[in-house]
Amino acid sequence: MLIVGLGNPGANYERTRHNIGFMVIDELVKKQNAQKISSSFDGTLFKFSNHFLLKPLTFMNLSGSAIRDVKQFYKIDEVVVIHDDLDLPFGTLRFKKGGGHGGHNGLRSTDEHISKEYIRVRMGIGKPEHKGEVASYVLSNFTKDEQAHLDEFITFTCKAIEALLTNTLEDVSSKYTIKNFPLK
């Protein structure tokens, strides 16, 4: 399985909403003691067991090419993409296979390069008050209230990803789909 976290490279974007996929990959690398195996493929690639973790180092809009290259080189069938989702309130976690990109340029690029048939782990980041503020919103840091729960949300998402390694999407979705983190 190839598990991809979407985000933008560089320190300026490290803790922004758009980089929540990168944050999950960073945590999975630690939890799984994954080994860095390559900085090729326009990304940083890690491996644990028979699974791969990828952080594309292209900007978000071009991430599909890195995913395609790793998928083809290692002949990987199953791809999971972790991404921010404006249409879900902060702390909401949902799972989906296939479907549209919903205006998300990282998903659009992925769809163009590998098809739409991959698992999406949708992490809610909320949306800005005004539609015209989307770009600045996704590239901004989380609020203090959100930051207070962000690590817990990321850890919970990691548990869901780990469950996907040995369970069906339906089982994982029924157990780990949440609304408005933190759980009470």
Curated annotation (Swiss-Prot):
List positions binding tRNA.
13, 59, 61, 105
Record-annotated site: Discriminates between blocked and unblocked aminoacyl-tRNA: 8
Task: Report the superkingdom from the record.
Answer: Bacteria
Q: What is its EC number?
A: 3.1.1.29
| MF (Gene Ontology) | peptidyl-tRNA hydrolase activity; tRNA binding
Q: How does it assemble?
A: Monomer.
What is the name listed in the Swiss-Prot or TrEMBL entry for this protein? Peptidyl-tRNA hydrolase
Organism field: Sulfurimonas denitrificans (strain ATCC 33889 / DSM 1251) (Thiomicrospira denitrificans (strain ATCC 33889 / DSM 1251))
High-level lineage: Bacteria, Pseudomonadati, Campylobacterota, Epsilonproteobacteria, Campylobacterales
